[in-house]
A protein has these predicted regions:
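Surface/interface recognition patches
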Residues: 1-153
Length: 153
């Protein structure tokens, strides 16, 4: 499994999680620490300007330990309703295209899969990532306009 953190300019971090690993608060906090280092290296000045992170209510995301770590980082948590893939940019923008790209391919080992995922993400222009974030703004506005009622494509 891969956890991908990205913004309108591109990928910040891809954290590949070994098969069979349970993602609990400890594991997720380690990933967030990696993300913070990635932001320091890839987006100079972003940490001082402020970071917002979009989270659903999965247990590792809302665990006391995770919330405390994000507060220590000074990051703003943006939540979205549970079971709302229409409001999760990775679910409606990134993963469908990645799945399409990988469809029908055969890989001899996990490293080959990881390499191909990294290659796919690296080959996307900043404008592609920006489009995913812009779609979020449009989808959120639709949700607001409908007083929170379900929005289909």
């Amino acid at each position: 499994m891969a956890t991908v953190f990205w913004d309108r300019k591109g990928v910040l971090l891809v954290d590949f999680i070994p098969a069979g690993t349970t993602v609990n608060a400890d594991r997720y906090c380690e990933t967030l620490k990696k993300l913070r280092r990635a932001i320091q290296n890839r987006r100079r000045g972003m940490l001082s300007k402020g970071v917002s992170i979009l989270h659903d209510n999965a247990r590792p995301h809302v665990a006391r330990q995770t919330v405390a770590l994000l507060q220590d980082f000074g990051w703003k948590i943006i939540t979205h309703p549970p079971y709302s893939p229409d409001l999760a940019p990775s679910d409606y923008h990134l993963f469908p295209k990645l799945k399409e790209h990988l469809a029908g391919r055969r890989f001899s080992n996990d490293e080959d899969v990881k390499d191909e995922v990294q290659r796919f993400l690296k080959d996307k222009a900043a404008s592609w990532y920006d489009m995913g974030i812009q779609k979020l703004l449009q989808r959120l506005q639709k949700c607001i306009d409908r007083n929170g009622d379900y929005v289909e494509k």
